[in-house]
Each structure stands twice: as structure tokens, then as C-alpha cells.
Amino acid sequence: MSFGGSGSITNRSTLKPLSVDDLRSPSPQKEYRGFRTSVSNIPQEKKFVPSHLSHFGSSQQRRFAPEVSSPLAEPYESSSSFRLSLSSPPSSKFGGPSFGTPKPFLHTNRLGTGSLIEDAPPTQSIYDFSSSRQINALNVGQSSSPFSPVSEKVYDPSFTMSGAPQDSNTSVIVFGFPPELTNQVIAEFSRFGTIISENSLTASSAGFTPSKGPISGNWLQLTYAEPSSAAKAVLSNGMLINDSFMVGCIYSPAEAKEHVPKTLRNSNKDLEMTDASSSETSMSIPVHADAHFQSQSGLGKKVIVQHKNDIFKSSQKHQPRNWLFHYLFGFGSTEPIDEEEKSKTASDNTSLQTSLFGKIVQVVLHTLFGF
């Protein structure tokens, strides 16, 4: 019992406690160092280099081959990684300070021209061309751009109404609304500016001069304090009021007429505005025809009717017979005849008498002598 106990005690004293390093796997650096030391102990034979490969100098082989003494160098590199390592140092390859920066352009090609150049590794990297291409692309883009930057146009209120004088025209004419909406129209147009006066135009106003008085009709003249307010009011031409009446707005012809040349003022194209009462009076004036007007066809002769009841009667065929008996025998129609009609038919009677006398002579000669 004592031997076993003593033996167990001695075994416990010889065991070592476990550490964190014992649980970790060996690092690749340690394995590579052990592999390098084992490889370096193996004797290597000197290889024979052919004469056609003798132009590869020892300096170039050192340049293209990775450093064996580097602890992070790989024993076997792929073709792609080998090509990238040609133009980039180890510091830039493994995240050094020059990582991501373009490399200088390599102009030298020491391999010369020959049949084996195609099999040789590349001497330039893709990063050697990026900087020059970017610079050339920027230069070409700036020089070959045919368009200049577009300048922003500043809004000029003087070009709002090019056809109207913006410096002096402050009066506008509003039309197209019923008289009961006059106050509402004035309230709507007061939003564009301060209204100095509200005048109504009449047909008797000479030169379109507004006459002060009560507002009547469906149009009026508004005078603003500033020309810009009048321009805004003209731009609102066609505004709807109560969704049923379209109101028009134009510049006042009184002020616009001052800027019109004299040759156009007297023309028939000038704007004229009259009331409905004046148009009705002008339409009611009768047209007087000339009493002595008579066309060759007998149309257009003035006819005077003595009695309104006889206006639809035609007694013209009996008139020559009455005048004939009155002229030959001294009696005829007892109806009163105007002096104007007598003077008119006197000339017709002479021509009728000669024609009738000639017909009687022709009838007598034909009866007596047969011709």
C-alpha cells in the first residue's frame, strides 16, 4: 500500500501542467523555418546551364526570384503571383506604405529581341499603365469638350411684357364680368398691387380718357401705383371668378396709344370701345335713299304709299289710263296725288303719249291700206 501510494506521488510530481502554447497548432513560420533548415542541410548538386540560356544573368535571376531569407516567402509561387511580384516590392505586396499607389513606368527591356522573349516573364505590371491613361483621359476630356458650361440666366422682370411699355403704363382694363361682381373683381385684382383709382369708361370719353363717376357696365379701368403691378394683372388675363366668369385684362388703350406711331393712330385698326346704348342708337338710324336714283332696269325706284292699307295693292296698270283720260278729256281719277308724283310722272306721260299716238296711226294705216 505504501509502495503504491509512493509511486503515485512520484508520478504526480513528474507531470507538467498544460499551457496555452501547448493547445495551439504550430505556426507556419516555425514550420517553414524547420523546413528551410532541413532543406539547407541536404547537399544540392550544381545544375548545368545551356548556352542559349546564358543571357539570363545572375542579377536578373535575383531580381525575378523571391528572397529565400524572407520568413514570409512562399516556397512555391503561382504564375500570377510571380508576375505581380515582378513590379511590386514585398512591402507593397503585403500591405506596406506604398500599397495601392501606381508604380513608375519601366522602360528597360534587357531581354532583347529573340525567339525566347515570348516565354520570358513580363517586365511591366498593369499598374504601370493606369496613371498615364487616367491623366490622358482627363486631358482629352477637358480639351475635346465642345460645350462650354451653361450660364444660368437671371430672370429680368422687364421682359415680362415685351410688347407694352414697362416704365409708364400703370392702367389696365378689366372686362367680361357682370356688374354685380364688380366689387369682387376689384378685390381679386387688388392682390397684384395697390390700386390708385377705379374708373369706368364711357363712349363719350374722347381719346379713351376715363371719366370719374359710378362704375357701370361690365368693364372698368384700374390704375396701379407701380408698372410691375399692372404687368402682373395683364398676365392674369383669362382668370376665372366663381368658376363661371372668365375675366380679361389688357393694358389701357389711353396709355398704349401714346406709344403708337401717328401713322397707325388714324387707321381703322385702332381699338375702339363703346357702350351698348351707343351701338343701339347707331343701328336705329334709317337709311335715306336718293329720290332721283333710278337704274336702267327700273329697280331701286323710290315708292311712296299714300295709305297704309293700300301697301299690298298694285294699281300701277290703271295709272296710265287715268292720266290719259285726264290729259285728253280733262277728267280722271279724283284721288289726291302728291306734287312730287306729278312731277315724276309728267316725263313718263309724254313718252307714253307719243307711243300711244304712234300705235293708233299704225292701226288706222293697217286697216285702210293693209300695211
Curated annotation (Swiss-Prot):
Repeat positions for FG: 3-4, 56-57, 94-95, 99-100, 175, 192-193, 329-330, 331-332, 357-358, 369-370
Region of interest (Disordered), residue spans: 1-72
Keyword tags: Glycoprotein, Membrane, mRNA transport, Nuclear pore complex, Nucleus, Phosphoprotein, Protein transport, Repeat, Translocation, Transport
Keyword Signal: no
RRM Nup35-type domain residues: 166-259
Membrane topology, as annotated: Peripheral membrane protein
Pfam family, one: RRM_Nup35
Domain text: Contains FG repeats. FG repeats are interaction sites for karyopherins (importins, exportins) and form probably an affinity gradient, guiding the transport proteins unidirectionally with their cargo through the NPC. FG repeat regions are highly flexible and lack ordered secondary structure. The overall conservation of FG repeats regarding exact sequence, spacing, and repeat unit length is limited. FG repeat types and their physico-chemical environment change across the NPC from the nucleoplasmic to the cytoplasmic side.
Protein name in the entry: Nucleoporin nup40
Organism in which the protein naturally occurs: Schizosaccharomyces pombe (strain 972 / ATCC 24843) (Fission yeast)
Lineage: Eukaryota, Fungi, Dikarya, Ascomycota, Taphrinomycotina
